[in-house]
Amino acid sequence: QYYNGLGYPTVSVATTGGGGQTACSLTAYDALGREESLYLPVPTGSTLDYVSPSSIISSAAGFYGDEYAYSRNHHDALDRVTSVELPGAEWRSADRRNCTSYSANTDNEVLHYEAHVGTNSLVKPKDTSFEYYPAGTLAKVTSTDADGKTAECFTDMLGNTILQRVRMTTGNLDTYFVYDEIGQLRFVLSPTYQKNGKKAISAYEYRYDYRGRVVKKILPGCEYIQYWYDKADKLICMQDGMMREQGLYRFTVYDCLGRVAIQGLCSDCDRK
């Protein structure tokens, strides 16, 4: 990896899988130090020596037979990427690109689920103080790929992902993430949950101890997985449904430096 005078990585040289050949790629920056262009890798011989950007640019056009052998980023005034022009003359001539827009949620757009510390219940939107998140309370990022397929991501003021939505012609595929009051992820509700409302077969559940460690994980349609930790918060024992039927545990023993020393199965673990 080679860097420019400002410490930005520009030229990357790596060994490929066959015959010790190397490939080189280039990252170009604009006047504000933002990533502007990323050139596709080109073969450069069998050494890891530095290759000038101008050589990479000319080699890329010749190797791929395309003057647009690179992707190009466009930014807004806040330095966020708003669109990416994809490599290839055919993509460029058709103005096919990946686009990203930034906004906020509107009324009746995102359902409001709740989970509370000390309970294992999922509180559905109709049972909360407000069924939908009020307008403007969530950040919304909309991504549209070159084929016109759209996905949306909603996050709260703490940066927690609340909803990932994939737009479909027949409806939306919504995955909700539910947190408790102290920011612990408690439930992940898959798109099928929005149809059947059955937590046991369509939701992921995580339970924590008083130190914020996951002690039980419940996956859709599976027996729960249980975890035990030592005083240093290292995982020492776990048991899934199949192990439970056989009376087994998977254990881990660490050395004095906290490195994994022994792992195995046992029928009687000291889970304290």
Model region roles, listed by residue range:
Residues 1-272:
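Beta-strand elements of repeat-based all-beta scaffolds
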